[in-house]
């Protein structure tokens, strides 16, 4: 019986693909070597310890229907589209060794005619007339008895969109999360015009087989049928939840300020695990009572635009004469935290 397992996903859903990855990783035998190939439609993928409000332009993502997905490995934020090929290598310990999986990817690129090399802790670069350019980034996860190495290869990604979603709004965030380091990147199509996702997957697969001296049939994972993986439904529900993708953000503080015709407002939030743990409101409004009441209501509230808007509008019952001001405030807060 082969020790290899090859899985290829037909889904472009990042939550689906990351749930598949997690389920395979948790239940794989210690003697198995796994290669999982996949890609995501428009998504910002953040590291396990990152703060999405700091890393991403969450408002622009919402406008453009770009998903946010938190992965279980560390590292920085990346933008995925269908111009990226994603790979995951898994193995039990002590065999797990990220230098092996890195060499498999380098061998695959070499077979395609691209000479690349490892750079730093987790990048693959090619040499160009303008200097080294990154074509692949990776992240890693290890438990007591197993490990995985996953990464992306830039085939024909829309690099102009990176800045749309990975450059955050100028929010006044004093965050404790890990800030992504931006690198100069290039697409493989600059070196191999017309290269496709299927060709890259085939090259990685062949390099994987060659390294281990075995072949195995690919298992196609399709969103049309629930994968036959232990606890997949629960894992997918968690991976796609607001609580995981946003609520797992490290503790941070957020300062919002705005001047309205009726006065200036300054809001100070402390946020932990996606909930407001402290809210302070400062204003020079001639009628500060609704704002003072709002500070109390926001304590414990989810740091989510619709929930904050709901708390603002709930004050209309007690302060009907301030309806105009409260609706302006509600719209501003909801827009500011998206």
Swiss-Prot record:
Enzyme class (EC, first level)? ligase
Record's GO cellular component terms: cytosol
Cross-referenced CDD domains: BPL_LplA_LipB (cd16435)
Annotated (R)-lipoate binding sites: 134
Q: What SUPFAM superfamilies does the record tag this protein with?
A: Class II aaRS and biotin synthetases, SufE/NifU
- Tell me the ranges covered by the BPL/LPL catalytic domain, including all copies: 29-216
Part of which pathway?
Protein modification; protein lipoylation via exogenous pathway; protein N(6)-(lipoyl)lysine from lipoate: step 1/2; Protein modification; protein lipoylation via exogenous pathway; protein N(6)-(lipoyl)lysine from lipoate: step 2/2
Q: Which Pfam family, giving just one, matches this sequence? A: LplA-B_cat
Q: Which domain of life is it from?
A: Bacteria
Q: Please state what the protein is called.
A: Lipoate-protein ligase A
- Species source reads Escherichia coli O17:K52:H18 (strain UMN026 / ExPEC)
